[in-house]
Swiss-Prot record:
Any one GO molecular-function label of the UniProt entry: UDP-glycosyltransferase activity
Membrane topology: Single-pass type II membrane protein
Entry's EC annotation: 2.4.1.-
Gene name per UniProt: Glt8d2
Organism: Mus musculus
Protein name: Glycosyltransferase 8 domain-containing protein 2
């Protein structure tokens, strides 16, 4: 009897230990799952949305990109990540400029653009050879350079942002639209500027309507053009509509047929986008793309108008870091000196 009693006691002890083990595992597992669930449920609410801004930093005008970045970062509290795109030879210099200047606090990623993707897609003849530089076509390849974002802002390097970039990012893109641009016809004070510097703002200025391929598009030559120097893009739609492939198709057609007008000298990258996005893009608030500051050194906007502008764009030959140029004081206030001493301002010659 004593032996059986001891056996029963041992079995009872083992049973109690087993039950305790099972109970511990359940409680511990439940706590772990609860913690994980809490993290998963809280993170989307607590995590501030990241705004990706893509900007190119070309070797000869790297100071432009740094000034643009400085103006964007200084005028917002938004959570930004800058994708600074360059050719392989310039990447160390880009990093040094950022890390050894006031820009060291920004969140950034340096992205290499491989120009071999452009082989056979660019005609060598242009009235403005600088527009044939590989980085001018980075905007065609946004989904290949930025992978983890649904919505992306692309900016030319010769811009200064005076508003909160969050406003531009909040631009509504209509269903089925892969991008938003600013129309050339809805720019405040645009008519005065166009008359003054002789600019065109229609497809006629970019496409050669003498060519059958252009005529067959059925696009009226008087259709208002847009400027792709400021883009808000939906990456899902861009990939779904195979925008990059479409743009490459029209680049190759131009190589074969010389389809684009050289009258403005700016149709190299703009013209394919005008064709691919015709009637299929949303619009940006005009104040978020005040342009033509670089077309004529004698053409000036009013100071009041410039103060209202959210973004200034010196598109054209006359850049604000060079001479002659206009409104360069607005640009120079955001200039970040080159730690290597290579990029210099040339305002007084």
């Amino acid at each position: 009897m004593a032996f059986l009693r001891k056996v029963n006691q041992v079995l009872l002890l083992l049973l109690v230990l087993t039950l305790c083990g099972i109970l511990y595992k359940k409680v511990h597992k439940g706590a772990v799952l609860k913690d994980k669930a809490d993290v998963d449920s809280e993170s989307p609410e607590d995590m501030e949305e990241e705004i990706p801004v893509v900007i190119c930093a070309a070797a000869g005008r790297m100071g432009a990109a740094m000034a643009a970045i400085n103006s964007i970062y200084s005028n917002t509290d938004a959570n930004l990540v800058f994708y600074v795109v360059g050719l392989r030879s310039t990447l160390p210099r880009i990093r040094k400029w950022i890390e050894h200047s006031k820009l060291r606090e920004i969140n950034f990623k340096i992205v290499e653009f491989n120009p071999t993707v452009l082989k056979g897609k660019i005609r060598p003849d242009s009235s403005r050879p600088e527009l044939l530089q590989p980085l001018n076509f980075v905007r065609f390849y946004l989904p290949l350079l930025v992978h983890q974002h649904e919505k992306v802002i692309y900016l030319d390097d010769d811009v200064i942002v005076q508003g909160d970039i969050q406003e531009l990012y909040d631009t509504t893109l209509a269903l089925g639209h892969a991008a938003a641009f600013s129309d050339d016809c809805d720019l405040p004070s645009a008519q005065d500027i166009h008359r003054l510097v002789g600019l065109q703002n229609t497809y006629m200025g970019y496409l050669d309507y003498r060519k059958k391929t252009i005529k067959d598009l059925g696009i009226s030559p008087s259709t208002c053009s847009f400027n792709p120097g400021v883009i808000v893009a939906n990456m899902t739609e861009w990939k779904h509509q195979r925008i990059t492939k479409q743009l490459e198709k029209w680049m190759q057609k131009n190589v074969e047929e010389n389809l684009y007008s050289s009258s403005l000298g700016g149709g190299v990258a703009t013209s394919p986008m005008l064709i691919v996005f015709h009637g299929k893009y949303s619009t940006i608030n005009p104040l978020w793309h005040i342009r033509h500051l670089g077309w004529n050194p004698d053409a000036r906007y009013s100071e009041h108008f410039l103060q209202e502008a959210k973004l200034l764009h010196w598109n054209g030959r006359h850049k604000p870091w060079d001479f002659p140029s206009v409104h360069n004081d607005l640009w120079e206030s955001w200039f970040v000196p080159d730690p290597a001493g290579i990029f210099k301002l040339h305002h007084n010659r």
